[in-house]
Amino acid sequence: MASKEIIYKEQTFKLAYELVNPSQDEVLLVLHGWGSNKEIMKQAFGNTLPDFKHIYLDMPGFGKSSNEMILNTVDYAKIVQLFLDELGVTATIAMGHSFGGKVSTLLNTPCLVLLSSAGIVTVKPWSVKVKIATFKLLKPLGMKKIRELFVAPDAQGMSHEMYETFKNVVDEDFEAEFTASKSKALCFWGKEDTATPLYTGEKIAGLIENSVFYPLDGDHFFFLTHKDFIAKTITEHCKETIQ
């Protein structure tokens, strides 16, 4: 594992990353989802796509990368781009899972690979709506441990900065960003995904002009069992984007 210090808005971020096939010229950037880290992505794809230099990055606040700022998705994309600039590389393909899919979309790489990407606002179940309403009612009273009782599972145990960041990105509508994308997009989705349901993938694929949609068996982490198919599809469909 290596690390690189990036300065963004006068704040220093120490970013942990790992390279696979470092002698290759074409670059595949792989970004994990919220609450995850580079290791699960490397586990899936580290032994695939041998013609690419893989960059597995812990985004700020995850894995072994630091974060002491309240961020939004645009901030993450700018930090990742600064990281790539610091490495002196240009990514041909950006692959992102869940939250990482939104960040990858903003990088405007020639080829974009979305794995159950976030970015489409879903209708909250009634129970969640009640929870939110109750939280808003109790918050002004200053009751202790309210945050612990009502925080989403994806945000538990986080620092204040990461919790506020989570609130910034969790229900973010990214339809305009997907529509504006000029990348060639391959959209892979788990048919049984409940975090980013299948219909959200269909919608994203419809918004990105140059896209192909692949529904596959599995849940939010379907790619762990479909890595070979995904790698083969990337090889076939992204080759014309390689300069």
Where do the language-model regions lie?
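Conserved HGGG/HGGXW glycine-rich cap/lid loop of the alpha/beta-hydrolase fold
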Residues: 19-64
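Short beta-strand/loop motif that positions the catalytic acidic residue
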Residues: 181, 187-189
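Flexible "cap/lid" loop of the alpha/beta hydrolase fold
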Residues: 102-141
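Catalytic histidine-centered segment of alpha/beta-hydrolase-like enzymes
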Residues: 219-231
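Hydrophobic, aromatic-rich cap/lid helix
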Residues: 148-176
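Active-site loop/oxyanion-hole signature of alpha/beta-hydrolase fold enzymes
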Residues: 56-93, 232
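Acidic catalytic loop of the alpha/beta-hydrolase fold
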Residues: 192-196, 221
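Alpha/beta-hydrolase fold catalytic core
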Residues: 1-28, 49-52, 90, 156, ...
